[in-house]
Amino acid sequence: MSTQIKREKPIKKQFQKKKFADLAVQGTNNSSIASKRSVELTYLPKLGVGSNAEKLQPGKPYFRYFVPKKIKRSPCINRGYWLRLHAVRSHIESILDSCQENITIINLGCGYDPLPFEMLDPQNPQYSRYSNRLNFIDIDYPDLLNIKSGVIKETPELLSIIGGIDPTETNMIISERYKTIPCDLYDMPAFEALLKSENLGHPNTIKIFIAEVSLAYMKHEKADDIIASCSKFPNSHFIMLEQIIPVGEYEPFSGRMLKHFSKNESPLQTVTKYQTIESQIERFRRYNFTNVNAGDMFQLWNSLSSNVHSKIENIEPFDELEEFHLFCHHYMICHATNNEQFKFNESIKFREPEVLPSLPISGLRIDSIDKIGFSKRFGSSVISKDSIIYTGGASPYRSDEADVINLEECTIETLSNMKLPDARVCHSYDSLMDGKLDILIGGRKAPHQPFNDVFIFEKQTASWEKVATLDYPIYRHATSSLSNDKLLLFGGNFCLKEPFLTITVKSETQIVVRSINCPDSIKSSIGAAMCYNEASNDVIILGGSSNGTEVSDKLIIMSYDDKSETLTVKKEVTNDLFKRYGSKIIHLTDDEYLVVGGTSPDRLFDASNSIITYNSRSDEIKSVRIPDHIWQGDELMLVGFELQKLNGKIIIFGGGATCYGFGSVNNSIYSIEK
């Protein structure tokens, strides 16, 4: 074998490997564009993006030309991709509205994005006032642009928008205001030559470079070279939407996201270098985009008006706020420019994330219990002797089963005589009358199918009895036993004028439901945590949302008077670590409380603050640190879980989440003790 052939083999292998990786990255475009098509079908007929969103106006459909098939994604994916569309388009509009100059928009890794046709279409009232000063350059892999160009050439509606095209170009589209230019972004000399050939150096022409999850698949050095090259042109803006991992690769959603892209042979390479918003801001400043505004996607969500939020809530039923929090904290939108005089639109000018102080460590420790394959979430449970009875929940489909979990024997048994009246999630299930009967309240099927029923399960006869129908449906409410025959219920519906109820059991077939007095400042919430401390006669509530977007950052301690059935606020404490949706709270001593899990609109929780203790006497908050072998190895996702005291230990079981389109995480079982 000659030396020449020996050299050619590794070169050929390297070329084939790169070609395969390029195809995998191109494949991500197919998934993304299909999800945007779902948004176009579900959202845009009722609510557009960019300026149309705040005007509550619909958007015109353009994705249909590239994805004619009707596609339906989950509500959380739809909401996430609507927000992605809004992120890029609202930031472009903020630049367009700030100037009168001609603008060239260069889409790096454009895929099948129809953005040029949206903005150049004279029949699109959202952008028609800009169209005579806009030019577009779509850049992507040659194979992908060949397909896109073919669709454009075969679609009269698209051709009519961009006008006549150069018939001599077979692999490109060249028209007066729109071009497709194939380029491998890894080939820096070719990329720089491309930019130079487009005469982008004129200072009176504004350049907008867009990278919507396109540079993320490149080695960070190569992606940095792209950013640096773009910054050399005067009056340039760079809009980037990209993944981040704010608390590191071991956070469960982060880990699942990274594994998903690696499994699909399109690993996220820049995110391991630029994990946080702060590092992304520093990145752009280092490469001469010195004027930078960046935030995560929930900050963008919060910039929308309450009218837009209400409109979105009415588009499709939605009860996936935890998943939406997690998704939004893993994507950032960054607008950077080398124009120091540019003023960012105040409505989308993000504040830099607040850094929380480190916490002292509590004396509690977390251990994992032998895995016994329990994978349900959003159910409800009671303690029965030395076992746990878990009802309903989903895995992934809603269940009507009751399971007995025996931790000593590491067994799970489904009780055939205890099947629930209906499959449900987000209900409450409590034991009263010395364990002789259990009470099931509310919950839901789908988000638009909530329950308002109350059932009692009489253990001696193993039968369910419907004992009441509430005036309104409730789910994601919180309950605590006040006495042997009385239950306190909080929230479960945004519209309640009286957020607390007591439910008193009179017999196996009769209950009395009463609203109780509480201060007007206490609003009904869903997803709040509550516990009752019998020794101090205190009711504690924490977090929750009263409107589906905002989450309370308060822990409120109230004294309960049984005779007058009145709650009186004793203490109200505000802290960012109390801003949780879907958390649980349990009292450890008269003064100390354990707060576990949930999600926040402001941040991702990590190994040091996912679980905390609060002392009501000293107001001290301590960390119940999740040990490395659990945090790094188990994907502990404190969403949709249950929390119970059993044999002197606190038990965390059930729970997990669907991590957007990246797969699901299910928890093992854990104990907390001194």
UniProtKB/Swiss-Prot annotation:
Indicate which residues the UniProt annotation says bind S-adenosyl-L-methionine.
Answer: 84, 109, 140, 184-185, 212
Q: List the disulfide bonds.
A: none
Named in its record, the pathway it takes part in is:
tRNA modification; wybutosine-tRNA(Phe) biosynthesis
Protein's UniProt keywords contain Glycosyltransferase? no
Q: Which GO terms describe its biological process?
A: tRNA methylation; wybutosine biosynthetic process
A molecular function annotated in GO for this UniProt entry is: tRNA methyltransferase activity
Q: What is its EC number?
A: 2.1.1.290, 2.3.1.231
Name the UniProt key words of this record, in alphabetical order: Methyltransferase, S-adenosyl-L-methionine, Transferase, tRNA processing
Pfam families in UniProt: Kelch_4 (PF13418), LCM (PF04072)
**Alphabetized InterPro entries for the sequence:** Gal_Oxase/kelch_b-propeller (IPR011043), Kelch-typ_b-propeller (IPR015915), Ppm1/Ppm2/Tcmp (IPR007213), SAM-dependent_MTases_sf (IPR029063)
Role of this protein: Probable S-adenosyl-L-methionine-dependent methyltransferase that acts as a component of the wybutosine biosynthesis pathway. Wybutosine is a hyper modified guanosine with a tricyclic base found at the 3'-position adjacent to the anticodon of eukaryotic phenylalanine tRNA. May methylate the carboxyl group of leucine residues to form alpha-leucine ester residues.
Say which family it is in. Belongs to the methyltransferase superfamily. LCMT family.
State the name under which the record lists this protein.
tRNA wybutosine-synthesizing protein 4
Q: Report which gene this protein is encoded by.
A: PPM2
